[in-house]
Amino acid sequence: MRLSRRRNGFGPLDKAVAIVVPLVLIAVGVVVYLLLRPEDCPGGLGKHGGECVGVTESAFDGDEDLDGLIRAVADENARVERAWEDPEQGQAPMPYGRIALMMPFTSDEASAMTAAMIRRALAGAHAAQLKANSSGGPHYQLLLAPDGKDLDQWRPVVDDLTALVDDRRSPLVGVMGLPSSTPETRDAMKELSARRIATVGPVITSADMNAAYFFKTSPNNSMFVDALGHYLKRNPGDRKGFLVYDSRPDDVYSRNLHRLLQKKFGKAYGLRQRSASYLGSTGPAAGIPQRFQSAAQKICLTESDTVFFAGRDQDLPALVKRLSQESSCDRRSPVRILKVGIGLEPTLTTDELTGMLRETRTRIVAAASVTPAWWTPRGLPAKGAPAGLGGFLRVFHDLDERYGIGEKPLDDGYAIMYHDAFTLLSNAYDRSYSEANEKPGSDDRTPAPARTPTKDDVYNTLINAGIVERDGRLLCTNCLQGAAGTYAFEQSPETHQWPICKPIPVIEYPAQGRGGPGKTYRTFEDTFAYPCP
């Protein structure tokens, strides 16, 4: 038997194989990885500044607590598209429009929105979407438009939104969100307005956040301060005031509120002589935030009974805690902290903070868009609640049971105000669609194909939902019957697209138990001869 002799070393063919085979394996591995790897930015979003931003109707990765809600919105969006593209047998295609929710979907400790705020805002917008889609058409997709946790990646988002406005089949109805009064939000607001896209800010309150196409469902800081003025006329206290303000120069909200409080109450409450600043926690690193030791000492040494707070709600618990630790305070005299905002942040009503407030005889007085007094402990509308609250509560409670929106999910007002912002746009599109497809004369046939309103039609409908006077009273013309009240908008240099006749309740926490804050202030009511409807 002849045995083969083993060669010693590599020949030319061996060397070629040794080189080619690893290269082929590497190439195959790269292809497999590219095919199977998770997308950098799912849902068609793009990577900008290290974050996934853009506009999508599909699911993507936000904060972990948002996963269920984001998937729910994506599923509803897919259902809406199927009802138009491939309706069930025997059903006519259901036309639909698109409303974009432009805000962060991720957060960190310095973000403009906390994770809890984002969750409540998304739940409110989705509740409005479900409510709108439960009735006759048109129906709506809720596009998700993440613009970065610091709101600074808005440019590619605005470009993506602009590309949707000329879609005649399923047009962009408008944009909602822009959740914080920052320089970045102001730039985004102005750019959307320049492109003539109707935009609604659900929780914008800085009085100088104005542009022709920018509508606000919340009152602004000036209106909140006026509501506090009405409260103080009834409850003046000892007029020994003190102003605590956020010193960040780039915080549009806090700077605007600081100026307004000084202007309104500076002389009567001695705020020019008694004030202290602190560094707010929202924004880039600039030192140690929430240092309230100096403010607390000065409040106690001056025996101030009325503290005006010009800062964000995230920082207020730290002030309350520092005041409770201040040994120089005379606990015999009550102190009240006056603030403005969308509602009552749950961090202000924890058992721990409530105990501190009671022990130190301190009370928070808040002029707000929303008050917990509007609903009962069982989650039903209370006496005197806005007409549109009940329908929202029914849908929202179902979402809360399924996805767990969080503790006291209504109290800060975000869910309610985001609901109203979506509803404002969907109502305007509904009316524009109906008018565009009115049946001429006695013809009861719908025009075929149905006419689709443009973004300009939606804007013109929005600015004509106003208040008129008749027979000694005021009447609404297409007012929004929102979960936060019945209010209107009109094109006027006086109103700047801020809500007309929006209620501003004043909240006392812990509650006094008697008396109460008095009559509810309504925006622009003093410009009319008769009470708001």
Map each language-model feature to its residues.
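N-terminal extracellular/periplasmic Venus flytrap/periplasmic-binding protein-like
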Residues: 42-156, 417
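Extracellular/periplasmic periplasmic-binding protein-like sensory domains
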Residues: 326-420, 437
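Long terminal accessory regions outside catalytic cores
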Residues: 1-98, 473, 479, 501, ...
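Short beta-strand elements at the ligand-binding edges of bilobed clamshell
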Residues: 200, 207-230, 354-381
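Segments of small-molecule ligand-sensing domains
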Residues: 405-412, 426-516, 531
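Periplasmic-binding protein-like
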Residues: 165-180, 197-202, 242-246, 299-319, ...
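Beta-alpha junction/loop-to-helix N-cap segments that form part of ligand/metal-binding clefts
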Residues: 116-120, 135-208, 497-498
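An alpha-beta-alpha
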Residues: 214-283, 305-306
